[in-house]
Amino acid sequence: MYCQDSNICAVFAVQGGKVGRKHGIKRGRRPSIRSPAQRARGPWIHESKHPAFAKQQINLEMPNSRATTELAWVCSSTSRKKKWARSLTLSTAPLSPPPSLVHCEDCSCLPGCHSGDLYNLAPAERTC
């Protein structure tokens, strides 16, 4: 409560716990932390349910960034995981050697390829 630096508070919590300051800090902090936590838990759970499903649907429908592709890869089924693993290995491997795969990275052979996403690169490399 009276600490200004987080480092000092950590030192007091670790070293001073044996003396009895740790128990005093716990008693003082617990009610102050619990009451906002209980208040925040109710609405936070309801708010997090709907965006969670929305995020999963968005990630599965439009995987654009690396974070969304990882989330969609985790949320998908085991059969999809194998396809994702294959597509990721295909998209990361042909950076240097075969010219046919490098040619397909430009989306010239697949009309459905909009931008250079990992999700769209893998089918382009497979079809070519």
UniProtKB/Swiss-Prot annotation:
Q: Offer a single GO CC term for the protein.
A: proteasome complex
Superkingdom in the source lineage: Eukaryota
- Cystine residue pairs: none
Q: Which Pfam families match?
A: DUF5543
Q: Basic residues compositional bias: what residue ranges?
A: 22-32
Q: Which GO terms describe its biological process?
A: double-strand break repair via homologous recombination
Which stretches of sequence are listed as region Disordered?
Answer: 22-42
- Protein name per Swiss-Prot or TrEMBL: Putative protein SEM1, isoform 2
> Whose protein is this, by species?
Homo sapiens (Human)
